[in-house]
Amino acid sequence: MTEGGEYSPAMMSAEPFLTMKKMKKSNHNKNNQRRFSDEQIKSLEMMFESETRLEPRKKVQLARELGLQPRQVAIWFQNKRARWKSKQLETEYNILRQNYDNLASQFESLKKEKQALVSELQRLKEATQKKTQEEERQCSGDQAVVALSSTHHESENEENRRRKPEEVRPEMEMKDDKGHHGVMCDHHDYEDDDNGYSNNIKREYFGGFEEEPDHLMNIVEPADSCLTSSDDWRGFKSDTTTLLDQSSNNYPWRDFWS
């Protein structure tokens, strides 16, 4: 600079270099001021573990103890909280990811187990339906057999009722004096008249005399209108009385007519 206060050309050409030098020196001092020593970082870490946020009064006190500006302490705590949150989120993410993988594995296992149970349930359902159908078919077959048997039994009963003969009381076997046997029964043909019915009873009672037709013919002989003489009538009456007496010796007439 000249006495008149003007810069010489040489000084003007050297001034930019001086300005740049001053700026570099100022930046170097700032970088030195931003760097923290190991002692300072250790103290700040210990304080951060106890408190993630500091009150303004504690910031000033900590900065004075460490030989730092309060703003430096605030910036360090702010950056530390950001890194801590990021690390915490990463840790939580890893935990959640591991839990998700475990749940996904369990879900796949449960899904396979469900498919197996559904298949087993379907198989049991089909088996139950098949068994039910077989039981229904068997029950229907049994009912058909019972119905057929009942129908056949009713048909047999109806046929037996149609074919069943008239109820006959036990036959009464009779024996005369000569050892001949005869049978007395009370069944008769309803189309016969009273005389025919009486003749049947007599024939069955006196069955032993069927072997001796001549004897019976001698007892009762047909005549045109009446007996020819009183002797014949007395002979017939005597023979008839004798016959009845012989028969009544073996079987009382009371028992016969009772």
Swiss-Prot record:
The keyword Mitochondrion does not apply. Keywords: DNA-binding, Homeobox, Nucleus, Stress response, Transcription, Transcription regulation. Residues 149-183 are annotated as: Disordered. GO terms for molecular function: DNA-binding transcription factor activity; DNA-binding transcription factor activity, RNA polymerase II-specific; transcription cis-regulatory region binding. It comes from the Eukaryota. Residues 89-124 are annotated as: Leucine-zipper. Gene3D superfamilies: Homeodomain-like (1.10.10.60). Residues 151-183 have a biased composition (Basic and acidic residues). One of its GO terms (biological process) is response to abscisic acid. GO terms for cellular component: nucleus. Widely expressed. Induction: By water deficit, by abscisic acid (ABA) and by salt stress. It is found in: Nucleus. Residues 29-88 bind DNA. Belongs to the HD-ZIP homeobox family. Class I subfamily. Probable transcription activator that may act as growth regulators in response to water deficit. Interacts with TBP2 and TFIIB1. This is Homeobox-leucine zipper protein ATHB-7. It comes from Arabidopsis thaliana. The lineage of its organism: Eukaryota, Viridiplantae, Streptophyta, Embryophyta, Tracheophyta. The gene is ATHB-7.
